[in-house]
Amino acid sequence: MLYDQIATNKRRTGYVMFGFGVLTLAIGAALGYLFWNSWVSGTVIAAVVAVVYMLIMISQSTNVVMSMNHAREIKDVSQAPQLWHLIEDMALVAQVPMPRVFIIDDPSPNAFATGNDPKHAAVAVTTGIMERLNREELEGVIGHEMSHVRNYDIRLQTIALALSAAIGLLVNFASNWFWWGGATRRRDDRDDSAGNIIGLVISIFLIILAPLAASIAQMALSRNREYLADASSVELTRNPQGLINALRKIDDSQPMKAADPNSAALYISDPFKHKQKFADLFATHPPIADRIARLEKM
C-alpha cells in the first residue's frame, strides 16, 4: 500500500509538470502568433523566459522564502536541542545532508521545507508546533518535511512557482501590448482568412485562461506532493500514528499570522485555514481528513 501510493503520486506529479511545460510553451506560441505571426518565435521566447525565471528562483529561493515568512535561523544545537536532534536524525534516516534550521515565531503549529536540492535545503517550524506536539508527533512532521527534501519536492515547487511567474509575465506583456494597440497593428497586416481568424481566437483564448490554468496546475502539484510526503514520512519513521496525531493538532488550530500567502503551498497544512468551495481545484493542500484516512490504511 505504501509503495503503491508513492508510485501513484510520482506519476501524477509527472503529468502535472508536463502540463505546466506545455501550457508555458502554448502561451508563447499564442503570443508569437498574435504579435509576430510566428508560432515558433513565441515558443522560443517563452522557453527562454521560463528558464531564466527558474534559474533566478532556484538560486535565491531559500533566503527569499525565509525572509517572507519572518523565519530566524538556528545555527547552533544549543538554541533548540530537541528540534535540532530530530532534524539531524531524520536527515540521517533519509540519507540527505543536514538542512539549515529555522524557527518562525507564531503560536499556530506548522512547518515547511524549501531550497534547491538536498544539499541546499532548509526546514522551518513554528514555535507553536514545538510547544503543542510531543516528540512522536514532531518526528512525523519532520519526517514529512525531510521527505520533501529527499523527493526533490522543494525543487519542483520552485520550478512550478517560476513557471507560474513566467506565464504571468508573458500574459502581462500581452495585456500591455493590446492596451497600446500593438496587436491591432499586427492584425492589420494579415488577411482575414478563416485560418487566421481561428488562430487569433485560439491565441486570445489561451492568453485569457493561462493564469487560471497555471494556478490550478500549481495547486494540483502541491496536493500530490503532500500525499507523497505523508507516505514517505511513514517510510522513514515507521509510525503513521505520530503523523496522524500531528495533523489532527495542526488542523485544530488558529490560522498563522507570520506566514506569507505566496508560500502557503510549502507548509505541511494550509496556514490560513481557507475553506474553498472548489477545494479540489484551488486548495493548496488536500483535506486533512483525506490525508489521515490514507495514513490509517498504512
Swiss-Prot record:
The active site is at E145. Pfam families: Peptidase_M48. It is an enzyme of class 3 (hydrolase). GO terms for biological process: proteolysis. The keyword Zinc applies. Keywords: Cell membrane, Hydrolase, Membrane, Metal-binding, Metalloprotease, Protease, Transmembrane, Transmembrane helix, Zinc. The chain crosses the membrane at residues 16-36, 38-58, 159-179, 197-217. Its main location: membrane. Signal peptide: none annotated. This is Protease HtpX homolog.
